[in-house]
Regions:
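Single-pass alpha-helical membrane anchors
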Residues: 1-23
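Cell-wall polysaccharide-cleaving catalytic domain and substrate-binding groove, primarily
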Residues: 16-124, 129-205
C-alpha cells in the first residue's frame, strides 16, 4: 500500500504540474498557450456565460453578475444537448443563453464545432469537451492551421496571416495591420495585442 500511495502521489503531483504548465486547460487542449492568451479578453472560467433577456445582454463571469434563470447549477455540469437547448430559447422570458464557457461559444458555433469534433449531445460540457470543441475551430481557418501544424514556412507573412485568423475567431484580439478588433466598431482597439498573439503562435514552431 505504501508503494501504491507513493505512486498515486507522484501521479497527482505530475498532473498538477501539467495543469500549471497547461494554463489550467485540460489534457485535450492542443494549443493551451494560445487559448490562455485569447481568453483573457473573453472569460475566466469554463462556467462563464452571457444571455439575452429581451434586447438586453447580461453576463456572468467568474461567478459574478446576472444568473440565467434556467441554470440551476454550474454550466460545466450540463450536457452539450442541454446547453444547445438553452441556447435555442427565445430572447423573451426566460431569455436565450448566448456565449458559453471558457471560449464564449455562441449557438451556431457550438453546433458547427460539435459536428466537427464528433461530440455527442450526451457529453458533459466540462473542461475536456470545451477544449475539444475549440480545437475543432483551428482547422476551419487554413492560415492559422497551416502555420501551427508547420505546413507553411515560418515567414513574417505567414505568421501575420495566422494572427489575422486568430483575430477573426476572437473579437478581443487585434489585427496585425492596426491592432484593432476585426469584429469591433470602426477604430475600436482590441484588448489582446496582436504582437502577443504572434509571439505565442511563433512558440509553436
Amino acid at each position: 500500500m505504501k508503494h501504491i500511495g507513493y505512486g498515486l502521489g507522484v501521479l497527482g503531483a505530475g498532473y498538477l504540474a501539467y495543469r500549471l504548465l497547461n494554463n489550467g486547460f485540460s489534457f485535450a487542449a492542443k494549443y493551451p498557450r494560445l487559448y490562455a492568451l485569447v481568453t483573457k479578453g473573453e472569460s475566466k472560467t469554463y462556467n462563464d456565460y452571457n444571455f439575452y433577456s429581451g434586447a438586453t445582454i447580461k453576463g456572468n463571469i467568474d461567478g459574478k453578475g446576472s444568473v440565467y434563470p434556467l441554470l440551476k447549477r454550474p454550466l460545466s455540469t450540463y450536457t452539450v444537448g442541454q446547453v444547445k437547448k438553452m441556447q435555442a430559447q427565445s430572447r423573451s422570458n426566460p431569455g436565450q443563453l448566448w456565449a458559453t464557457g471558457r471560449f464564449q461559444i455562441i449557438p451556431t458555433t457550438l453546433i458547427m464545432l460539435q459536428r466537427a469534433a464528433k461530440i455527442s449531445d450526451n457529453a458533459i460540457y466540462g473542461k475536456v469537451t470545451q477544449d475539444r470543441l475549440i480545437n475543432a475551430i483551428i482547422p476551419i481557418y487554413p492560415n492559422l492551421n497551416n502555420y501551427l501544424t508547420g505546413k507553411v514556412a515560418d515567414t513574417d507573412a505567414n505568421l501575420k496571416a495566422a494572427a489575422l485568423d486568430v483575430a477573426k475567431i476572437w473579437s478581443s484580439v487585434g489585427m496585425p495591420s492596426n491592432n484593432k478588433s476585426y469584429w469591433g466598431k470602426k477604430g475600436e482597439r482590441a484588448t489582446t495585442n496582436t504582437l502577443d498573439v504572434q509571439k505565442v503562435l511563433k512558440s509553436y514552431r
